[in-house]
A protein has these predicted regions:
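Phosphate-binding glycine-rich loops and adjacent basic patches that engage nucleotide phosphates
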Residues: 1-13, 86-91, 127-143, 190
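Auxiliary alpha/beta "docking" domains used to position bulky ligands
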Residues: 2-117, 156
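A sequence-level detector of short, solvent-exposed, charge-rich linear segments
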Residues: 16, 20, 69, 121, ...
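Immediate flanking context of iron-sulfur cluster ligation sites
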Residues: 110-119, 160-171
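Short helix/strand-bridging catalytic loops that position acidic/His residues to coordinate divalent metals
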Residues: 115, 147-162
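Iron-sulfur cluster-binding cysteine motifs and their immediate structural context
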Residues: 123-147, 153, 167-190
Length: 191
């Protein structure tokens, strides 16, 4: 079972923060509670409810916590399609959402995957400050500002430092420019 949880806050001041060198830019997903814990708790509750209804079964929730191919599963489950920036896009919600999976040993019907809808758009590719989207659907993590500011152990390579601007934790440029995100739904979460 693949699920999504919106995280776009009502007061998402992307441009004003990025344009103000006195402020540090933090990726939108990191502004609220730890989504790993929150979504995992909800998936566990869903598993418990399914078990209460169906009887004994095995299940395990995953939220970016194991080598589970979340995007591939979400695409196959019909949550959306893989955009050229390599994120899942949804016609009604854009890409501002988290993914989670509940692996379960219960046969369930499978939803139809959505067709790719990016067409000729290359906005995410051309806006990437470091050229990390090296081809449609291909991101070179070693160039991605999100990787460089969150995952990289050690110093950020000198060639990328001027391109960071005031980004101190993550980068949302490819999502901000994506036309599908004009349909994004605000989060129901209060933080």
């Amino acid at each position: 079972i693949s699920v999504r949880m919106n995280y776009l806050p009502a007061k998402a001041a992307f441009a004003s923060t990025l344009q103000n060198p006195q402020l540090g830019y933090v990726s939108r997903y990191a502004l609220g509670r730890d989504y790993h814990k929150l979504l995992r708790q909800r998936l566990k509750k869903l598993g418990d409810q399914i078990q209460a209804y169906c009887g004994e079964l095995n299940f395990r929730p995953f939220v970016d916590s194991a080598p589970v191919m979340e995007r591939a599963l979400a695409a196959k489950a019909g949550i959306g399609w893989v955009g050229k920036h390599s994120l899942i896009l949804n016609r009604e919600a854009g890409s501002w959402f988290f993914l989670g999976e509940l692996l379960i040993d219960l046969p369930l019907p499978v939803d139809q995957p959505q067709e790719e809808q990016c067409g000729r758009c290359v906005a995410c590719i051309t806006t990437c400050p470091t050229g990390a989207i090296v081809a449609p659907y291909t991101v070179d993590a070693r160039r991605c500002i999100s990787y460089l500011t969150i995952e990289l152990e050690g110093a950020i390579p000198e060639e990328f430092r001027p391109l960071l601007g005031n980004r101190i934790y993550g980068c949302d440029d490819c999502q901000q420019i994506c036309p599908w995100n004009r349909f994004s739904q605000l989060t129901d979460e209060d933080d």
